[in-house]
């Protein structure tokens, strides 16, 4: 009986340790990511830009090879094997969409927001994203490539 009691205490402590390790991992992953903000001027109306960022049909020609949407869950496919799931966490029609990758921390997201500059009379697509400290330039390059795809697909 004493051995069984000691084993149960050890098992509880192991679970506590396991939970503690998971919490530390989450905190470290949050701390290691930095916010990225990029602006891209686009030659198109807000409604045209919105069609490309606010719907799965609009996202599929430029952001991913295929995009499926069920309720607030978007599944993005690249090539034959890469797939990622994101949840739509906020949206204001005609203004912005904000997604959180399913496999990322709750505090990270990526957002696409449409703004208008009165001086230049151009719309801008503002991107907010998060990346590991050593991968910031790679992430920016990826967004540059994605926006170039958007411009080619849409004529913006």
Where on the chain are the PLM-derived regions?
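Hydrophobic pocket/interface hotspot
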Residues: 49-50, 59, 74, 88, ...
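Beta-strand/loop substructures that line and gate deep hydrophobic ligand-binding cavities in soluble
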Residues: 98-152, 156
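A short, structured loop/turn motif at beta-sheet edges
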Residues: 46, 90-93, 115-122
């Amino acid at each position: 009986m004493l051995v069984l009691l000691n084993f149960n205490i050890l098992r509880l402590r192991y679970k506590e340790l396991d939970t503690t390790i998971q919490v530390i991992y989450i905190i470290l992953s949050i701390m290691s990511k930095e916010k990225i903000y990029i602006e891209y001027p686009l030659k198109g109306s807000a409604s045209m830009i919105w069609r490309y960022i606010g719907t799965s049909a609009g996202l599929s020609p430029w952001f991913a090879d295929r995009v499926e949407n069920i309720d607030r869950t978007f599944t993005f496919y690249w090539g034959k094997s890469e797939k990622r799931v994101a949840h739509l966490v906020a949206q204001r029609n005609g203004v912005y969409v904000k997604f959180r990758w399913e496999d990322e921390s709750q505090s990270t997201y990526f957002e696409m927001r449409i703004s208008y500059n009165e001086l230049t009379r151009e719309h801008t697509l503002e991107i907010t994203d998060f990346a590991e400290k050593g991968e910031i330039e790679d992430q920016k390059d990826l967004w540059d490539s994605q926006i170039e795809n958007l411009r080619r697909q849409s004529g913006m």
